[in-house]
Amino acid sequence: MFINNNLFYFFIILTFLGIKSDISKSKTKKKPNVLILFSDQHNKKTMGFENHPDVITPNLDKLSNESVVFDRAYATRGICVPSRMSLMTGLYPRTMGLMDNNEETSVTDRATSLASVFKYNGYKTYAFGKRHLKGGGDKGWDIKKEVHPEEGDNGNYLSWIIAHGYEAEFSYDWAAEFGKGPKGSKEANAKIPTANLGTRISKLPFGYSMEAYTALETIKMIDQQKNSDKPFFCFSSFYRPHQPYNPVKKFMDMYNVSEWGKGTKLNSAIKMPASFYQPTKDLPPLLQFQRNGGNKVWNMDKAFKDEQLWRNFIGAYYALVTEIDHYVGDILQALDKANIKEETIIIYTSDHGDFAGNHGMVEKAAAGHNVYEDILNIPLMIRIPGKTVQGKHTAELVTLADIIPTLIETLNLKTPKLENNFEGVSLANLVLKDKPLNRDYIVSESWFQSTVISKSAKLGIMKQNLVNSSQDYREFGDMFFDRINDPLEINNGINDQKNQQTIAQLRVFYEEFIKQVPGIGITEIVNKK
């Protein structure tokens, strides 16, 4: 009996230890990794799954089938830095005082970045490729490698390409827009010919572009992290399809630009964008200026006399999107090979779009009017292994400022002390439980134009430019687009009587927005003037 009692207690102890071990394991279970795949200036419609007649993106198509896809995701401002900072800080440009690329305020200096939040929660943090961030938005990285040399970085593309013997080739590519080599290169002060519409075929061989470098560093990180007991947050940020438009030959050869055709997917030449011939007089002032050759970098007036230049640019843009897709595929394959794809949340998005020939325009027309869908509507897909409904599309209105609160709620992250509370909203219930967000509107704004976007309409409000009086376009008037009946945004219906009730409601929405987001950063910038 004594022996039996001892055995009984022995088994009780073993069972207790087993339970305790399981509890301990559950407490220390590693959180999911987070990988943001980011591109610069990616027009949302230029992907295969968007039924584009030309653009080839098999890897993004596959990712979309595994993700929740946001059809109505928008940039908070249609240029790089303000939009990227909204992603990284959860703040709107007016709060940061960051309406252009070069502004800095006490808000940007003290902002808490997404990387800092992850680091605070025990993540290893990485950034590869173009960051283009300010102040606190660029803090919190354990390892960071940019395109150009940056103080405090762990490496950069320029040093890498020089080490491989292709400095002159990269400088030639860079000069297509800037007329000289990149800062830090031997050709930084050289005079190298620019290219019409910033477009020419790269002299670099396949595998040596900025995109290749970003992918290579990301894949190396994945291999290093696969057995780590620490989760990772990685911001893999491709420079392209931003100008200069220099695809390598491998991808350019996929598009026939010799004439206008029915589309690459019909084994024809590229198809002319539907709004390509929109009359100049119907465009807002800054775009009229560009169209008439006001910016000699783009030579749009020359291009309309020789449409081959337009086809070269549009084909090059498509080729750059396909190149990004190729490297996205390599990164996703590396996750599979490391057997950690199902442990990794994957987000694909961009900071803003590119006209890509629509409205007869190139790039974002040098930070032109902050209103068109081509510039503001961005790709966004979120894949959470085992939780997201695969291939689901949602038409809910969202912005990049929503990403940081979404990840915090989804992963139950703790936040360090915040100087300013996040202004975006969490999409967790929408992504994980398919609960509607029921947002009536969102706002994207520059110094001279604020755009209110509802589910069916858009109002671009011209306003007093508080920092640059030469860019004050109130005389031109506001712009209204019926997104249901005019998806190409060709007809400005601001004076149409049938639109007045909708326009009035959009103005009410904007007044509501500026009360909720008063613009402490804007006030700081204006007071400095």
Regions found by a protein language model. Give the residues of each.
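Active-site-proximal N-terminal segment of extracellular/periplasmic enzymes that hydrolyze or transfer
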Residues: K27-V68, K119, K249, N491-N499
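Active-site regions of oxyanion-processing enzymes, predominantly non-cytosolic
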Residues: K29-V34, G135-Y157, S171-D173, M210-P273, ...
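A short beta-strand-to-alpha-helix junction
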Residues: K30, P53-T57, Y74-I79, E104-T112, ...
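Short, structured active-site-proximal loop/turn typified by the sulfatase FGly-forming signature C/S-X-P-X-R
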Residues: N51-R84, G90-L91, T95-M96, K119-Y126, ...
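Histidine-centered active-site microenvironments of extracellular/periplasmic hydrolases
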Residues: V55, P247, Q333-T388, T399
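Polar, surface-exposed loop/tail segments
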Residues: T57-P58, L87, K130, G136-G140, ...
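Catalytic-site neighborhoods of secreted/periplasmic enzymes
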Residues: T89-P205
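C-terminal, low-complexity/hydrophilic appendages and adjacent surface loops
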Residues: D173, Y372-L376, S444-N495, N527
